[in-house]
Protein backbone atom coordinates (compact mmCIF):
# COMPACT_ATOMS: atom_id res chain seq x y z
CA UNK A 1 0.00 0.00 0.00
CA UNK A 2 1.32 3.44 -0.88
CA UNK A 3 2.31 5.64 2.05
CA UNK A 4 1.04 8.71 0.21
CA UNK A 5 -2.06 10.29 1.67
CA UNK A 6 -5.02 9.28 -0.47
CA UNK A 7 -6.64 12.69 -0.13
CA UNK A 8 -3.66 14.09 -2.04
CA UNK A 9 -3.14 11.11 -4.32
CA UNK A 10 -6.73 11.24 -5.57
CA UNK A 11 -7.29 14.98 -5.34
CA UNK A 12 -8.82 16.19 -8.65
CA UNK A 13 -6.23 18.07 -10.72
CA UNK A 14 -8.67 19.84 -13.01
CA UNK A 15 -12.22 21.16 -12.80
CA UNK A 16 -13.43 18.30 -15.02
CA UNK A 17 -12.45 15.78 -12.33
CA UNK A 18 -14.40 17.40 -9.49
CA UNK A 19 -17.32 15.36 -8.17
CA UNK A 20 -20.59 17.25 -7.64
CA UNK A 21 -20.71 21.08 -7.19
CA UNK A 22 -21.86 21.29 -10.84
CA UNK A 23 -22.98 24.93 -10.82
CA UNK A 24 -19.79 26.10 -9.16
CA UNK A 25 -17.62 24.13 -11.58
CA UNK A 26 -19.59 25.53 -14.52
CA UNK A 27 -18.94 29.12 -13.43
CA UNK A 28 -15.26 28.47 -12.73
CA UNK A 29 -14.83 26.99 -16.21
CA UNK A 30 -16.16 30.24 -17.63
CA UNK A 31 -13.41 32.11 -15.78
CA UNK A 32 -10.83 29.76 -17.32
CA UNK A 33 -12.31 30.17 -20.78
CA UNK A 34 -12.30 33.97 -20.56
CA UNK A 35 -8.99 34.17 -18.66
CA UNK A 36 -10.64 36.70 -16.42
CA UNK A 37 -12.20 36.47 -12.96
CA UNK A 38 -13.02 38.54 -9.88
CA UNK A 39 -11.72 37.85 -6.40
CA UNK A 40 -13.43 34.73 -5.08
CA UNK A 41 -14.69 33.59 -1.69
CA UNK A 42 -15.24 29.84 -1.32
CA UNK A 43 -17.36 29.11 1.76
CA UNK A 44 -18.73 25.87 3.15
CA UNK A 45 -18.17 23.01 5.61
CA UNK A 46 -14.82 21.16 5.78
CA UNK A 47 -14.19 18.49 3.17
CA UNK A 48 -16.57 19.86 0.54
CA UNK A 49 -13.90 20.59 -2.09
CA UNK A 50 -13.13 24.27 -1.58
CA UNK A 51 -9.33 23.97 -1.64
CA UNK A 52 -9.51 21.32 -4.36
CA UNK A 53 -11.60 23.65 -6.55
CA UNK A 54 -9.14 26.52 -6.03
CA UNK A 55 -6.15 24.37 -6.99
CA UNK A 56 -7.99 22.84 -9.95
CA UNK A 57 -8.84 26.35 -11.15
CA UNK A 58 -5.15 27.26 -10.92
CA UNK A 59 -4.18 24.12 -12.88
CA UNK A 60 -6.70 24.86 -15.62
CA UNK A 61 -5.77 28.54 -15.85
CA UNK A 62 -1.99 28.22 -15.98
CA UNK A 63 -1.26 24.65 -17.00
CA UNK A 64 2.30 23.57 -16.24
CA UNK A 65 3.22 27.01 -14.89
CA UNK A 66 0.49 27.03 -12.23
CA UNK A 67 2.98 26.87 -9.35
CA UNK A 68 4.82 29.94 -10.64
CA UNK A 69 1.56 31.89 -10.72
CA UNK A 70 -0.02 30.70 -7.47
CA UNK A 71 0.77 31.57 -3.87
CA UNK A 72 -0.83 29.31 -1.26
CA UNK A 73 -1.08 30.43 2.35
CA UNK A 74 -2.88 28.97 5.35
CA UNK A 75 -4.31 31.73 7.50
CA UNK A 76 -4.43 29.44 10.55
CA UNK A 77 -0.64 29.30 10.53
CA UNK A 78 0.02 32.80 9.28
CA UNK A 79 -2.63 35.05 10.73
CA UNK A 80 -0.81 38.29 11.39
CA UNK A 81 -0.61 41.60 9.62
CA UNK A 82 3.08 41.04 8.87
CA UNK A 83 2.28 38.20 6.48
CA UNK A 84 -0.28 40.33 4.67
CA UNK A 85 2.13 43.23 4.37
CA UNK A 86 5.19 41.23 3.37
CA UNK A 87 4.64 37.85 1.67
CA UNK A 88 1.42 38.72 -0.14
CA UNK A 89 2.52 42.23 -1.08
CA UNK A 90 5.92 41.04 -2.33
CA UNK A 91 4.27 38.32 -4.38
CA UNK A 92 1.50 40.59 -5.70
CA UNK A 93 4.02 43.13 -6.96
CA UNK A 94 5.49 40.70 -9.53
CA UNK A 95 3.96 40.15 -12.97
CA UNK A 96 2.35 36.84 -13.97
CA UNK A 97 4.08 34.29 -16.20
CA UNK A 98 2.20 33.32 -19.38
CA UNK A 99 -0.85 34.69 -21.16
CA UNK A 100 -3.18 34.96 -18.16
CA UNK A 101 -3.03 38.61 -17.06
CA UNK A 102 -3.09 37.95 -13.31
CA UNK A 103 -1.60 35.76 -10.59
CA UNK A 104 -3.48 33.89 -7.86
CA UNK A 105 -3.25 34.11 -4.09
CA UNK A 106 -5.08 31.22 -2.39
CA UNK A 107 -5.68 31.98 1.27
CA UNK A 108 -7.00 28.90 3.08
CA UNK A 109 -8.91 29.16 6.39
CA UNK A 110 -9.26 32.89 5.84
CA UNK A 111 -11.99 33.06 8.47
CA UNK A 112 -9.27 32.47 11.10
CA UNK A 113 -7.57 35.76 10.27
CA UNK A 114 -7.71 38.55 12.82
CA UNK A 115 -9.83 41.60 12.07
CA UNK A 116 -6.72 43.75 11.61
CA UNK A 117 -5.22 41.21 9.22
CA UNK A 118 -8.43 41.19 7.17
CA UNK A 119 -8.39 44.99 6.96
CA UNK A 120 -4.78 44.83 5.74
CA UNK A 121 -5.80 42.16 3.22
CA UNK A 122 -8.62 44.38 1.95
CA UNK A 123 -6.18 47.20 1.24
CA UNK A 124 -3.78 44.78 -0.46
CA UNK A 125 -6.60 43.43 -2.66
CA UNK A 126 -7.44 46.98 -3.73
CA UNK A 127 -3.83 47.94 -4.38
CA UNK A 128 -2.88 44.94 -6.54
CA UNK A 129 -6.18 44.05 -8.23
CA UNK A 130 -4.73 44.88 -11.65
CA UNK A 131 -2.45 41.83 -11.74
CA UNK A 132 -3.55 39.65 -8.78
CA UNK A 133 -6.72 37.74 -7.92
CA UNK A 134 -7.44 36.38 -4.47
CA UNK A 135 -9.30 33.17 -3.62
CA UNK A 136 -10.32 33.18 0.04
CA UNK A 137 -11.37 29.85 1.53
CA UNK A 138 -13.48 29.79 4.68
CA UNK A 139 -15.78 27.50 6.59
CA UNK A 140 -17.89 30.50 7.60
CA UNK A 141 -18.39 33.39 5.21
CA UNK A 142 -19.89 35.39 8.08
CA UNK A 143 -16.44 35.59 9.69
CA UNK A 144 -15.06 37.47 6.69
CA UNK A 145 -15.48 41.24 7.04
CA UNK A 146 -18.11 42.79 4.78
CA UNK A 147 -15.67 45.03 2.83
CA UNK A 148 -13.86 41.87 1.65
CA UNK A 149 -17.08 39.96 0.94
CA UNK A 150 -18.32 42.83 -1.22
CA UNK A 151 -15.16 42.59 -3.35
CA UNK A 152 -15.58 38.86 -3.99
CA UNK A 153 -17.85 36.55 -5.93
CA UNK A 154 -19.10 34.18 -3.24
CA UNK A 155 -19.37 30.44 -3.94
CA UNK A 156 -21.12 28.31 -1.33
CA UNK A 157 -20.03 24.67 -1.30
CA UNK A 158 -22.40 21.95 -0.10
CA UNK A 159 -21.51 18.56 1.41
CA UNK A 160 -21.25 15.78 -1.17
CA UNK A 161 -24.47 13.72 -1.46
CA UNK A 162 -24.22 10.31 0.14
CA UNK A 163 -24.46 8.41 -3.15
CA UNK A 164 -21.69 10.46 -4.78
CA UNK A 165 -19.48 10.03 -1.71
CA UNK A 166 -19.98 6.25 -1.79
CA UNK A 167 -19.17 6.18 -5.49
CA UNK A 168 -15.93 8.10 -4.91
CA UNK A 169 -14.89 5.88 -2.01
CA UNK A 170 -15.60 2.71 -4.00
CA UNK A 171 -13.53 4.08 -6.89
CA UNK A 172 -10.58 4.83 -4.59
CA UNK A 173 -10.87 1.36 -3.04
CA UNK A 174 -10.79 -0.16 -6.52
CA UNK A 175 -7.68 1.85 -7.43
CA UNK A 176 -5.96 0.64 -4.25
CA UNK A 177 -6.98 -2.99 -4.73
CA UNK A 178 -9.04 -3.25 -1.56
CA UNK A 179 -12.66 -4.21 -0.94
CA UNK A 180 -15.11 -2.13 1.05
CA UNK A 181 -18.61 -3.34 1.89
CA UNK A 182 -21.80 -1.35 2.34
CA UNK A 183 -21.62 -1.54 6.13
CA UNK A 184 -18.16 0.00 6.06
CA UNK A 185 -19.33 2.80 3.78
CA UNK A 186 -22.25 3.54 6.11
CA UNK A 187 -19.88 3.64 9.09
CA UNK A 188 -17.50 5.97 7.26
CA UNK A 189 -20.39 8.24 6.27
CA UNK A 190 -21.70 8.27 9.84
CA UNK A 191 -18.30 9.37 11.09
CA UNK A 192 -17.47 11.89 8.36
CA UNK A 193 -20.87 13.63 8.22
CA UNK A 194 -20.41 14.80 4.62
CA UNK A 195 -16.70 15.63 4.96
CA UNK A 196 -15.19 13.76 1.99
CA UNK A 197 -11.62 14.46 3.10
CA UNK A 198 -12.33 12.86 6.47
CA UNK A 199 -14.09 9.95 4.75
CA UNK A 200 -11.08 9.23 2.52
CA UNK A 201 -8.70 9.44 5.48
CA UNK A 202 -10.90 7.01 7.41
CA UNK A 203 -10.94 4.58 4.49
CA UNK A 204 -7.13 4.70 4.27
CA UNK A 205 -6.77 4.14 8.02
CA UNK A 206 -9.12 1.16 7.86
CA UNK A 207 -7.25 -0.32 4.88
CA UNK A 208 -4.07 -0.36 6.99
CA UNK A 209 -5.80 -2.88 9.28
CA UNK A 210 -7.37 -5.06 6.59
CA UNK A 211 -7.57 -5.16 2.80
CA UNK A 212 -11.19 -6.21 3.28
CA UNK A 213 -12.75 -3.15 4.90
CA UNK A 214 -15.88 -3.92 6.91
CA UNK A 215 -17.87 -1.98 9.48
CA UNK A 216 -15.91 -3.68 12.27
CA UNK A 217 -12.61 -2.67 10.67
CA UNK A 218 -13.73 0.96 10.30
CA UNK A 219 -14.63 1.30 13.98
CA UNK A 220 -11.41 -0.46 14.98
CA UNK A 221 -9.44 2.04 12.89
CA UNK A 222 -11.31 4.95 14.46
CA UNK A 223 -11.03 3.60 17.98
CA UNK A 224 -14.71 4.41 18.38
CA UNK A 225 -17.80 2.59 19.52
CA UNK A 226 -20.52 1.80 17.06
CA UNK A 227 -23.50 4.16 16.99
CA UNK A 228 -25.56 1.07 17.82
CA UNK A 229 -24.09 0.98 21.33
CA UNK A 230 -25.03 4.60 21.97
CA UNK A 231 -28.44 3.92 20.45
CA UNK A 232 -29.01 1.04 22.88
CA UNK A 233 -28.23 3.35 25.81
CA UNK A 234 -30.75 5.91 24.55
CA UNK A 235 -33.38 3.23 23.96
CA UNK A 236 -32.93 1.95 27.52
CA UNK A 237 -33.48 5.46 28.87
CA UNK A 238 -36.52 6.07 26.67
CA UNK A 239 -38.04 2.81 27.95
CA UNK A 240 -37.46 3.92 31.54
CA UNK A 241 -34.71 1.35 32.22
CA UNK A 242 -32.38 3.85 33.89
CA UNK A 243 -30.12 1.33 35.64
CA UNK A 244 -29.51 -0.40 32.33
CA UNK A 245 -28.91 2.97 30.66
CA UNK A 246 -26.44 3.88 33.44
CA UNK A 247 -24.47 0.66 32.88
CA UNK A 248 -24.26 1.35 29.16
CA UNK A 249 -23.20 4.94 29.83
CA UNK A 250 -20.39 3.79 32.13
CA UNK A 251 -19.27 1.33 29.48
CA UNK A 252 -18.96 4.17 26.98
CA UNK A 253 -17.18 6.48 29.42
CA UNK A 254 -14.77 4.10 31.11
CA UNK A 255 -14.31 1.07 28.85
CA UNK A 256 -14.30 2.90 25.52
CA UNK A 257 -12.86 6.13 26.89
CA UNK A 258 -15.36 8.45 25.23
CA UNK A 259 -15.61 11.97 26.59
CA UNK A 260 -18.90 13.46 27.68
CA UNK A 261 -18.84 15.76 24.66
CA UNK A 262 -18.34 12.76 22.33
CA UNK A 263 -21.36 11.01 23.84
CA UNK A 264 -23.46 14.19 23.64
CA UNK A 265 -22.67 14.43 19.92
CA UNK A 266 -23.80 10.83 19.44
CA UNK A 267 -26.99 11.48 21.41
CA UNK A 268 -27.70 14.66 19.44
CA UNK A 269 -27.26 12.77 16.18
CA UNK A 270 -29.46 9.90 17.33
CA UNK A 271 -32.24 12.17 18.57
CA UNK A 272 -32.26 14.04 15.25
CA UNK A 273 -32.20 10.85 13.17
CA UNK A 274 -35.06 9.39 15.28
CA UNK A 275 -33.69 5.90 14.70
CA UNK A 276 -34.23 5.04 18.37
CA UNK A 277 -37.80 6.32 18.59
CA UNK A 278 -40.25 8.39 16.57
CA UNK A 279 -41.02 11.73 18.19
CA UNK A 280 -43.49 14.51 17.49
CA UNK A 281 -42.05 17.95 16.79
CA UNK A 282 -42.73 19.33 20.27
CA UNK A 283 -41.05 16.39 22.01
CA UNK A 284 -38.11 16.49 19.61
CA UNK A 285 -37.64 20.20 20.29
CA UNK A 286 -37.75 19.59 24.06
CA UNK A 287 -35.13 16.83 23.83
CA UNK A 288 -32.80 18.95 21.69
CA UNK A 289 -32.96 21.76 24.26
CA UNK A 290 -32.03 19.27 27.00
CA UNK A 291 -29.11 17.97 24.93
CA UNK A 292 -27.87 21.50 24.33
CA UNK A 293 -28.09 22.42 28.02
CA UNK A 294 -26.20 19.27 29.01
CA UNK A 295 -23.50 19.94 26.45
CA UNK A 296 -23.07 23.47 27.82
CA UNK A 297 -22.69 22.24 31.40
CA UNK A 298 -20.16 19.58 30.41
CA UNK A 299 -18.10 22.07 28.40
CA UNK A 300 -18.18 24.42 31.41
CA UNK A 301 -16.55 21.70 33.52
CA UNK A 302 -19.36 19.75 35.17
CA UNK A 303 -18.94 16.01 35.86
CA UNK A 304 -19.57 14.02 32.66
CA UNK A 305 -21.29 11.02 34.23
CA UNK A 306 -23.57 13.06 36.50
CA UNK A 307 -24.68 15.37 33.69
CA UNK A 308 -25.22 12.57 31.17
CA UNK A 309 -27.14 10.48 33.70
CA UNK A 310 -29.34 13.50 34.42
CA UNK A 311 -29.93 13.85 30.68
CA UNK A 312 -30.88 10.17 30.33
CA UNK A 313 -33.31 10.59 33.24
CA UNK A 314 -34.88 13.58 31.51
CA UNK A 315 -35.12 11.57 28.28
CA UNK A 316 -37.07 8.93 30.20
CA UNK A 317 -39.45 11.54 31.63
CA UNK A 318 -40.01 13.23 28.27
CA UNK A 319 -40.64 9.88 26.58
CA UNK A 320 -43.12 8.87 29.30
CA UNK A 321 -44.94 12.20 28.99
CA UNK A 322 -45.07 11.86 25.19
CA UNK A 323 -46.47 8.33 25.47
CA UNK A 324 -49.31 9.56 27.68
CA UNK A 325 -49.75 12.29 25.17
Swiss-Prot record:
Segments crossing the lipid bilayer: none
Keywords on record: ATP-binding, DNA replication, Nucleotide-binding
One Pfam entry name: Rep_fac_C
Record Gene3D superfamilies: 1.10.8.60, 1.20.272.10, P-loop containing nucleotide triphosphate hydrolases (3.40.50.300)
GO molecular function annotation: ATP binding; ATP hydrolysis activity; DNA binding; DNA clamp loader activity
Coiled coil ranges: none
GO biological process, one term: DNA repair
Residues bound to ATP: 44-51
GO cellular component: DNA replication factor C complex
Subunit organization: Heteromultimer composed of small subunits (RfcS) and large subunits (RfcL).
NCBIfam families the UniProt entry points to: PRK00440.1
Protein name: Replication factor C small subunit
Amino acid sequence: MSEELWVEKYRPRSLDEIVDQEEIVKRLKEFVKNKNMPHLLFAGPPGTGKTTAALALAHDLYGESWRDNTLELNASDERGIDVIRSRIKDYARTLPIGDVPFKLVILDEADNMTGDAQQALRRTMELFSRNTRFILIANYASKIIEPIQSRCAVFRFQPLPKGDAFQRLRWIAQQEGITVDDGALEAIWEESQGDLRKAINTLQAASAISRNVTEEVVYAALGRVKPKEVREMIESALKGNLLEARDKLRLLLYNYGLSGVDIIRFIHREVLSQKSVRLDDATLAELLVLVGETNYRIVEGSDDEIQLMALLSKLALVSKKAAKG
